[in-house]
């Protein structure tokens, strides 16, 4: 998780200050590297007010001995031998400075919410063809045209442990195949 998007009940100005903001995801403290008003997908809104503020987060150091310390929204289930989404993914933000539209005073806001059912996964959206053959799920995408208006297909067979089930986003994110797009 490299971004969190907060929705406010009114628009705020681009004067978002995150210097004293504290963020935790799944109980892991995260460093805020950037903040800005955005649309509901986390894309920056230039020179305008918005109901959304995006905080960009640095990745925590990977710890293979404490997977819970990695702040990942999925885990490997030892009983089913599959990767699964966590049941809960708490996001806590404290002391973000914002200015409401029509105001000149900044105010500090804090929020805590379960974000597991509000996942945005733009890295897997390019895999827009999804289906099933028998009990095997698949996802595919159409590559950009190469030189001479030709494309060369790349076939990736997802066969890692845990990379099965009905949610194709899990295997796409589990093995970083989206990096090949």
Model-predicted regions and their roles:
Residues 1-136:
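Non-catalytic beta-sheet/beta-sandwich ligand-binding modules that flank or precede catalytic cores
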Residues 14-17, 148, 163-167:
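Short, solvent-exposed loop/turn elements at domain surfaces
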Residues 47, 147-151, 172-176:
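Extracellular/periplasmic catalytic domains that process cell-envelope and extracellular macromolecules
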Residues 66-68, 150, 165-170:
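Short, solvent-exposed loop/turn and secondary-structure capping segments
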Residues 131-147, 154:
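A short loop-to-beta-strand scaffold at the N-terminal edge of the catalytic core in hydrolase folds
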Residues 139-142, 155, 164-171:
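Divalent metal-dependent phosphoesterase catalytic cores across multiple superfamilies
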Residues 150-161:
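Short beta-strand element of the alpha/beta-hydrolase
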Residues 161-181:
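Active-site machinery of serine-nucleophile hydrolases
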């Amino acid at each position: 998780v490299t971004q969190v998007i907060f929705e406010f009940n009114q628009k705020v100005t681009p004067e978002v200050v995150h210097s004293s903001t504290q963020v935790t995801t799944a109980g892991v403290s995260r460093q805020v590297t950037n903040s800005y008003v955005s649309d509901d997908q986390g894309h920056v809104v230039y020179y305008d007010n918005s109901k959304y503020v995006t905080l960009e987060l640095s990745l925590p150091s990977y710890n293979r001995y404490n997977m819970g310390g990695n702040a990942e929204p999925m885990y490997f289930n030892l009983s089913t031998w599959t990767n699964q989404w966590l049941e809960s993914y708490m996001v806590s933000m404290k002391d973000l400075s914002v200015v409401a539209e029509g105001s000149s005073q900044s105010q500090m806001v804090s929020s805590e919410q379960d974000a597991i059912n509000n996942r945005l996964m733009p890295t897997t959206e390019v895999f827009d063809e999804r289906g099933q053959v028998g009990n095997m799920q698949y996802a595919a995408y159409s590559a950009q045209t190469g030189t001479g208006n030709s494309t060369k297909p790349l076939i990736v067979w997802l066969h890692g442990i845990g990379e099965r089930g009905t949610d194709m986003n899990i295997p796409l994110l589990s093995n970083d195949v989206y990096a090949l797009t």
